[in-house]
């Protein structure tokens, strides 16, 4: 009987244990990673084995004792299985909240300045609730705070770190109030933390902003919203660039069409030329007195292609042009005095076959104008014309540019020594260097021309381009050969593009056979003066180098005073070096600013000696010697302003 009663009691206890009455939640000790992964967790259910054990025991009991109480005992299964029902596992519940509502991974949006990151050697995927509780208590003890004030915000598996924050003592549940990380770390007992939590292997405790800020910012950038923002920004940028390119292309097409229209409408009108009647028409057989015949007038119209079309009109219907040479305002290269293409074919430069340049009618007319044009201005007239800029512009447009046809220079490969392929030296006034050998004609070439001065003085100036890397030796050879006392440089080394190379040394340099020494440097307001000594063998020459740097890019100076002062200083040095060679003047191409300086210098001498000035004749004379001198109408006006400023300084006694 005792055996019959004891066995069911034992089965009852086993079923109670299987129902969870004595064991609390055994799955609390599962790893955090198992809960976090949201995968189904299979928990071993003790009740299944216990059920099997009970069934076996009952079968044995029935077999041995055959007691009528067997039916009553077998009914205990339903009572045992229904007592203390186990709730189904819900993965949405936080593992840390199941046993301790105060200990949970909160995942709150805490500012980076309030977050502390603790780096562990221990794998954080193995942390369960017990270990996290120990960790929180250890951190709280090291800070001297309550464990409830230490909050584990999240676990960072990639870097094996625990992110936590500390709340004030009066924090209410659900609030995100937290203390500053820097303030918390100042009160942290690091040694105590390592001693109290040795099993975690704490390697570093730092604010979140120094450890994870870059990662968070990168996560924000490559988030869905960040990706859309980048795509939108790139799309807007591409649209803007495309619109700018379209506008630029439309502007280029408009300028091209306007330029083509100007070329089509370009005409040169010559003054009427009386045509003599044929002798057979002028005489009558039976009369000694011949009536005067109204002379017919031949008008010659030269189209842009250089073809002459004669047109005969009666003199009574012919209107005389107020100017002997009138030209509509056109571009710089169209006014070059030649219809030959400006493109220089480098492959044809090596040809040694001699050729003869034939002047076209237009070139002959242009040269006649350059040699005869004149407009003498008194001092009062000079002041008046300076106030009328439109008159100066119209006058400038009538002056032929007189650029040189490349075929006129019979030197193979001379294009390698030209800075600009359309700016070439006039052959009649070209500076020829002494050849290194008889067969090397290229060694005699330099892009420079002798320029006549006041009263037609020969070789008063040399106008040349800014030296290039391969022409620096040629430049110094020319200065030595011509015994030039002064060099005037009116350009910077670079203005958007390279304008001139640095062709002088800092102290001493050797260029070919010429040694150059810098003996002194003087800084003035608008230019720098260098005293140079040139040596070749036992001979020496003293040269002054003026570097004018105040000329602005792509326009004329606002005031002519600095250039006028430079001109006066150069003129003083030239007079002190009487008997020596020409003054060398260069800018970049050797025609624009160079022409302004030389024209101003000649005009000032004329005003000083005669009391009048003929700027038109001066510029025409310069273009005969070197094509394109005084390159733009703005520079032509600037020359008149400089002459007017010089005139205002002359004494009233100067004869007009």
Swiss-Prot record:
Residues 274-289 have a biased composition (Polar residues). Residues 24-226 are extracellular. One of its GO terms (biological process) is negative regulation of ERK1 and ERK2 cascade. One of its GO terms (molecular function) is protein kinase binding. It is an enzyme of class 3 (hydrolase). Residues 269-289 are annotated as: Disordered. It comes from the Eukaryota. The modification Phosphoserine is found at residues 271, 338. Changing residue 338 to E: Mimics phosphorylation by PKA, prevents MAPK binding. Glycans are attached at residues 23, 128. PROSITE patterns: TYR_PHOSPHATASE_1, TYR_PHOSPHATASE_2, TYR_PHOSPHATASE_PTP. Residues 1-23 form the signal peptide. Pfam families: Y_phosphatase (PF00102). SUPFAM superfamilies: (Phosphotyrosine protein) phosphatases II (SSF52799). GO terms for cellular component: cell junction; cytosol; plasma membrane. The keyword Membrane applies. Keywords: Cell membrane, Cytoplasm, Glycoprotein, Hydrolase, Membrane, Phosphoprotein, Protein phosphatase, Proteoglycan, Receptor, Signal, Transmembrane, Transmembrane helix. Residues 392-646 form the Tyrosine-protein phosphatase domain. Sequesters mitogen-activated protein kinases (MAPKs) such as MAPK1, MAPK3 and MAPK14 in the cytoplasm in an inactive form. The MAPKs bind to a dephosphorylated kinase interacting motif, phosphorylation of which by the protein kinase A complex releases the MAPKs for activation and translocation into the nucleus. Isoform gamma may have a role in patterning and cellular proliferation of skeletal elements in the precartilaginous/cartilaginous skeleton. Interacts with MAPKs. This is Receptor-type tyrosine-protein phosphatase R. It comes from Mus musculus (Mouse).
């Amino acid at each position: 009987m005792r055996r019959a009663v004891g066995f069911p009691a034992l089965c009852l206890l086993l079923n109670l244990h299987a129902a969870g009455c004595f064991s609390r939640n055994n799955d609390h000790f599962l790893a955090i990673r198992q809960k976090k992964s949201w995968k189904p967790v299979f928990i071993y259910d003790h009740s299944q084995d216990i059920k099997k054990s009970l069934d076996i025991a009952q079968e044995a009991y029935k077999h041995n004792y055959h007691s009528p109480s067997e039916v009553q005992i077998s009914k205990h299964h339903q009572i045992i299985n229904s007592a203390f029902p186990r709730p189904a596992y819900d993965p949405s519940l936080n593992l840390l909240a199941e046993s301790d509502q105060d200990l949970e991974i909160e995942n709150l949006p805490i500012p980076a300045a309030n977050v502390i990151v603790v780096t562990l050697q221990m794998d954080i995927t193995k942390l369960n609730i017990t270990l996290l509780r120990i960790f929180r208590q250890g951190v709280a003890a090291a800070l001297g705070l309550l464990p409830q004030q230490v909050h584990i915000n999240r676990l960072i598996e990639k870097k094996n770190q625990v992110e936590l924050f500390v709340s004030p003592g009066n924090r209410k549940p659900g609030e995100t109030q937290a203390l500053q990380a820097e303030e918390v770390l100042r009160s942290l007992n690091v040694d105590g933390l390592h001693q109290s939590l040795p099993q975690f292997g704490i390697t570093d405790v730092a604010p979140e902003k120094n450890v994870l800020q870059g990662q968070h910012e990168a996560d924000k950038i490559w988030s869905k919203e960040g990706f859309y923002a980048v795509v939108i920004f790139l799309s807007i940028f591409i649209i803007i660039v495309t619109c700018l390119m379209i506008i630029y292309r439309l502007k280029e097409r408009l300028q091209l069409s306007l330029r083509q229209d100007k070329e089509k409408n370009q005409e040169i009108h010559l003054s009427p030329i009386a045509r003599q009647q044929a002798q057979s028409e002028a005489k009558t057989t039976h009369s000694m007195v011949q009536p005067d015949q109204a002379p017919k007038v031949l008008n010659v119209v030269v189209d842009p292609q250089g073809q002459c079309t004669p047109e005969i009109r009666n003199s009574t219907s012919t209107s005389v042009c107020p100017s002997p040479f009138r030209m509509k305002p056109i571009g710089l290269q169209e006014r070059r005095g030649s219809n030959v293409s400006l493109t220089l074919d480098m492959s044809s430069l090596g040809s040694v076959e001699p050729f003869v340049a034939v002047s076209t009618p237009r070139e002959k007319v242009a040269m006649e104008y350059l040699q005869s044009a004149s407009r003498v201005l008194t001092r009062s007239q000079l002041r008046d014309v300076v106030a009328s800029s439109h008159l100066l512009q119209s006058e400038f447009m009538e002056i032929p540019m007189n650029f040189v046809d490349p075929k006129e220079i019979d030197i193979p490969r001379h294009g390698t020594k030209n800075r600009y392929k359309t700016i070439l030296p006039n052959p009649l006034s070209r500076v020829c260097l002494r050849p290194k050998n008889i067969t090397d004609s290229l060694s005699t070439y330099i892009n420079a021309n002798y320029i006549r001065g006041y009263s037609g003085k020969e070789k008063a100036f040399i106008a040349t381009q800014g030296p290039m890397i391969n022409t620096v030796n040629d430049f110094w050879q020319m200065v030595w050969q011509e015994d030039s006392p002064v060099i005037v440089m009116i350009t910077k080394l670079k203005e958007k593009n390279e304008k001139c190379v640095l062709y002088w040394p800092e102290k001493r340099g050797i260029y070919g056979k010429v040694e150059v020494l810098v003996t002194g440097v003087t800084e003035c307001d608008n230019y720098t003066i260098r005293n140079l000594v040139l040596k070749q063998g036992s001979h020496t020459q003293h040269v002054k180098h003026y570097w004018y740097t105040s000329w602005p890019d792509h326009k004329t100076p606002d005031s002519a005073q600095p250039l006028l002062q430079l001109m006066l200083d150069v003129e003083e040095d030239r007079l002190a070096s009487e008997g020596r060679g020409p003054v060398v003047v260069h800018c970049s191409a050797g025609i624009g600013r160079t022409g302004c300086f030389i024209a101003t210098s000649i005009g000032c001498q004329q005003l000083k000696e005669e009391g009048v000035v003929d700027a038109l004749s001066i510029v025409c004379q310069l273009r005969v010697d070197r094509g394109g001198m005084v390159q733009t109408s703005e520079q032509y006006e600037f020359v008149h302003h400089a002459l007017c400023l010089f005139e205002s300084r002359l004494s009233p006694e100067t004869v007009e």
